[in-house]
Amino acid sequence: SRDDVSIHANYHANDPSQGWAMSRVSDQMTAAQKRHSDPADTANYVEHYNAVVGVNADFYNMTTGAPSGALVMEGVEYHSGASANFFAILKDGTAMIGSSSDYAAYKDQIQEAVGGSVYLVKDGKSVVTSAADYYNSRHSRTCVGITAEGKVVLMVLDGRQEPFSAGGSAEELAQIMLDAGCVTAINLDGGGSTTFVAKQEGSNTLTVVNRPSDGYERSVSSSLMVVSTAPVSTEFDHAL
């Protein structure tokens, strides 16, 4: 872990208090960058703030944009996680994945959180049991997991675009997360929502790195964002 890298929940305009809405992950990251980069805004300014990676997160109401599960940003709860599994960063910086029944016990400790659906990995083992066709068949997928060392793994699979990409079933995704060293992982929204945005090496421009199955970047509900506060230098570094 590094003190100058953190993971945050994100939402439309980087501000759910404006009401439910949908927007692209790239636009959510741009809004966060703008909000935290103005030195005159002393309440929100963060020195060297740099939104570098973002992925789509929770399932959502496709009419209103309301997330299905938890949404906590900067310690403020905008939507409860009492009805779905969730991924969270606690106030002490620890990453965790919990079930809906865990939410009440951890609520006061949560700094950032998004909801998810089924567990893929639990206690170091694949726990995919759903008989639903969506989980058994191959689709674009997004998920988040945590390793035994507490590192967070964000995973995106392109799909629905054969022969370019076939996607994966939930069971296949669970195996990928196990191979990545995860001891716990949950599925996030997938299909046309699956999005991976990043500033690529040597660039300060956000680009969609994957190939969304809709043919364009879909407007979604919540997202997860990786932020660096390391001073910008002319030297390349790599997240390993």
What residue ranges belong to the model's regions?
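A short, polar/proline- and glycine-enriched secondary-structure boundary/capping micro-motif
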Residues: 17-25, 106-111, 163-170
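Conserved, well-ordered active-site substructure
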Residues: 64-82, 89, 129-183, 193-237
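Zymogen propeptides
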Residues: 1-86, 96
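Short, solvent-exposed aromatic-acidic interface loops
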Residues: 10-18, 100-105, 157-162
